[in-house]
């Protein structure tokens, strides 16, 4: 395979079937735009050039790519062949191998791309390599007519003979060619068809007419699944999630009800992790070995240390870091919370913008009050502190090591190491008051009924 590789990614379609203000190829799969799934696979090849052909909503694509690829604009949009031609300027002087990919076909593995490039560099020097597949239902696809692994003809379903329609090998649209061959062939493509468009597939028939060979590489249908509608987007998400679940279990995680666990593209799981039903991982989650995540948790942007227990019904928000063997229980929410080894918040607690030392315990109903309507403030809690139930810690504040905050306290000033802080109104005891109150109210109610 040549060391000089370029990738042209076609993303100029309007995506009208998505019915969205967001560009079609930026709709997320596993919390990542589908285009970036494809670009990650492309990057595994270390290409010298990456060109994304854009049309509608080009500003969205430019922002999403963040300068990692050159943009070429197709305006007007006159077919796939015309789209590829728009990348010629960006590839001026490039004399290596070119992959032609589609932004709405996001799951093409790098290994498949390598196979196409390897075939392009074979001794028989094909002019074009076509990526083909055999779908369950070939009705909507153009056919690839072959002799061995040579492509002798490409034909759309509507134009195919009965014999050609019986062929199950279909065109994915993805191709590879030498840069000089690609643009020379494209220059000869015409719009002599009903749609008055320049079709990329015509370069195969032109090359064959010149006596040049064209080759085929076959792949799995799932690798070239296209996404043009919300239903196809949902199917792609399901496909990706099924793959990730299998990968997680093969890597040593136990999923009690795999079909109910949802991962993001970058979720990392250690060994001997147990995940109960209905757990959702947003982006940026790292889970160490031996963690138990109980049912109905939502976790994003969090790092969970070895041996931790999370949930059920817990929410870990971005910036959460749990030390070894920490416990976050039911109806606990954390955000920008760094919790040391063995910290326990077992129920009904909010911990935001807080750093907590090892072995500190939070009683039910504890809240770090971190926002005054304008700014966020931080809470610092030392090791082995005990925060009693129904306590409000008003930031900015520091609670010292080994300190105790008594239940029901609203703490607004720092608590020293080893100190007890009790902020609670004196209990008022009035014997018989409740009996007299009930008696008076019953009499009043009876009088109103007369």
Residue ranges and their predicted role:
Residues 1-20:
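N-terminal nucleotide-binding beta1-loop-alpha1 segment
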Residues 29, 101, 421:
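Catalytic metal- and UDP-sugar-binding loop of GT-A-like glycosyltransferases, i.e.
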Residues 260-325:
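Acidic, glycine-rich loop-and-beta core segments that form the ion-binding/anion-interacting portion
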Residues 1-6, 32-118, 123, 442-443:
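Conserved N-terminal catalytic core of the sugar/cofactor nucleotidyltransferase
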Residues 309-450:
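Glycine-rich hexapeptide-repeat left-handed beta-helix
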Residues 3, 168-269:
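Conserved alpha/beta core of the MobA/IspD/sugar-nucleotide pyrophosphorylase nucleotidyltransferase superfamily
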Residues 59, 67, 108-194, 201:
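Conserved core of the sugar-phosphate nucleotidyltransferase
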Residues 10-11, 53, 101-102, 130-134, ...:
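Short beta-strand segments
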